[in-house]
């Protein structure tokens, strides 16, 4: 069997769990080439404006993004994309993808999530191909990053909860990586922030598992404004 014929995970319980873990760690690793390192989700402007100046401020900002902003929204869209794909409900998947794209608050954030979603799909198609991927993608005008992860995870038989927790961990880790370069923070402080956000990630995952599409919404005006103002920031390292 070649790499491109990887297909769904084997049915044997132990082998399936290990295969799911292997794929999950690969897809959500910083080494998976979707360009996450080049985006800050508006953090660069928040640092420039003085909203984030140390580890405590970064922790508070990210906790709010998780509970009341894009973290929760993206997690909930991943959940709905995974479930729709599992049920082979293409109409529902298309609706989820359309709504997820519409929720993005700024042009640069749209670029960020659409580009990462597109890259995720392309790499999955090339290295981890499976039946149904092309058909599912064809039904969606835009596949943003969380929808892409939910879709591919379901098609490969990766269970929803570990996929969701892995996604949120990867999301937070990327934010912290950006913050550590911008504030800047040392490696130990960065890990302290990641450790402090563990219960917030768990709570966000649990909430998103039970959220309907009507429950999805954000209340992070300052973070959304940062992503808008970053578009005209004079000196910057990141694309968002």
Swiss-Prot record:
Single GO MF annotation: nickel cation binding
Protein's cellular compartments: Cytoplasm
Keywords of this entry: Chaperone, Cytoplasm, Nickel insertion
This protein's name: Urease accessory protein UreF
Naturally occurring in which organism (per UniProt): Bradyrhizobium sp. (strain ORS 278)
Family according to the record: Belongs to the UreF family.
Known role: Required for maturation of urease via the functional incorporation of the urease nickel metallocenter.
Main location: cytoplasm
Gene3D superfamilies, alphabetized: Urease accessory protein UreF (1.10.4190.10)
This protein's GO CC annotations: cytoplasm
Keyword Transmembrane found: no
Subunit description: UreD, UreF and UreG form a complex that acts as a GTP-hydrolysis-dependent molecular chaperone, activating the urease apoprotein by helping to assemble the nickel containing metallocenter of UreC. The UreE protein probably delivers the nickel.
PANTHER family: UREASE ACCESSORY PROTEIN F
Pfam families from the UniProt entry: UreF (PF01730)
């Amino acid at each position: 069997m070649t790499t491109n014929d990887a297909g769904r995970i084997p049915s044997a319980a132990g082998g399936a769990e290990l295969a799911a873990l292997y794929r999950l760690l690969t897809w959500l690793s910083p080494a998976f080439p979707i360009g996450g390192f080049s985006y800050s989700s508006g953090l660069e402007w928040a640092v420039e404006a003085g909203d984030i100046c140390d580890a405590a401020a970064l922790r508070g900002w990210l906790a709010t993004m998780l509970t009341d902003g894009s973290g929760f929204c993206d997690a909930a869209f991943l959940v709905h994309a995974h479930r729709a794909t599992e049920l082979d409900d293409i109409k529902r998947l298309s609706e989820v993808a359309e709504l997820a794209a519409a929720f993005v608050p700024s042009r640069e954030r749209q670029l960020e999530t659409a580009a990462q979603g597109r890259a995720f799909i392309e790499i999955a198609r090339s290295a981890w191909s499976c039946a149904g991927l092309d058909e599912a993608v064809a039904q969606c005008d835009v596949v943003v990053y969380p929808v892409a992860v939910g879709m591919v995870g379901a098609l490969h038989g990766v269970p929803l909860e570990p996929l969701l927790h892995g996604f949120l961990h990867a999301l937070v880790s990327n934010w912290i990586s950006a913050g550590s370069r911008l504030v800047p923070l040392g490696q130990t402080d960065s890990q302290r922030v990641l450790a402090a956000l563990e219960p917030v990630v768990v709570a966000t995952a649990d909430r998103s598992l039970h959220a309907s599409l009507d429950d999805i919404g954000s209340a992070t005006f300052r973070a959304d404004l940062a992503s808008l103002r970053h578009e005209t920031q004079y000196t910057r390292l990141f694309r968002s």
